[in-house]
């Protein structure tokens, strides 16, 4: 990830338009900003969300609210609570997200 030609700025995430992305179950609401090749998102997963695909994109992710369970293709599962994060490189380890009955809110950079 190269951060170049990004002037100092601030984001009021409540002003960023949200888009809905359906999961296998539930949905995700994304508020997205693009800074050159860097995508920055505030994502709210609905209760009982399950991603509809195995993701191979790299991310740095921080849980802000709720619980996020990340399942890796090799069978490992990790549950993150608010204040916890993970990082994974592009094409390193396929993974998918799910939430429990409370949903989750995340900050993601990729």
What are these regions (language model features)?
Residues 85-88, 101-110:
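A short hydrophobic beta-strand segment most commonly corresponding to one strand
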Residues 1-41:
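A short, N-terminal "cap"/entry segment at the start of jelly-roll beta-barrel domains
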Residues 52-53, 70-71, 88-89, 93-101:
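Short beta-strand His + acidic residue motifs that chelate non-heme Fe in jelly-roll/DSBH
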Residues 74-91:
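Short acidic-glycine-tyrosine-enriched beta hairpin
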Residues 45, 54-70:
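Short, conserved beta-strand element in jelly-roll/cupin
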Residues 36-55, 89-92:
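Conserved short histidine dyad/triad with adjacent acidic residue
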């Amino acid at each position: 990830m190269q951060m170049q030609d990004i002037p100092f700025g601030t984001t009021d995430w409540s002003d960023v338009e949200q888009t809905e992305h359906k999961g296998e179950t539930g949905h995700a609401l994304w508020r997205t900003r693009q800074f050159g090749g860097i995508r920055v998102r505030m994502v709210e997963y609905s209760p009982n969300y399950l991603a509809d695909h195995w993701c191979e994109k790299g991310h740095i992710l921080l849980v802000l609210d709720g619980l996020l369970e990340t399942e890796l293709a090799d069978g490992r599962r990790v549950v993150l609570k608010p204040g916890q994060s993970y990082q994974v490189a592009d094409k390193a380890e396929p993974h998918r997200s799910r939430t429990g009955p409370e949903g989750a809110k995340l900050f993601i950079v990729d």
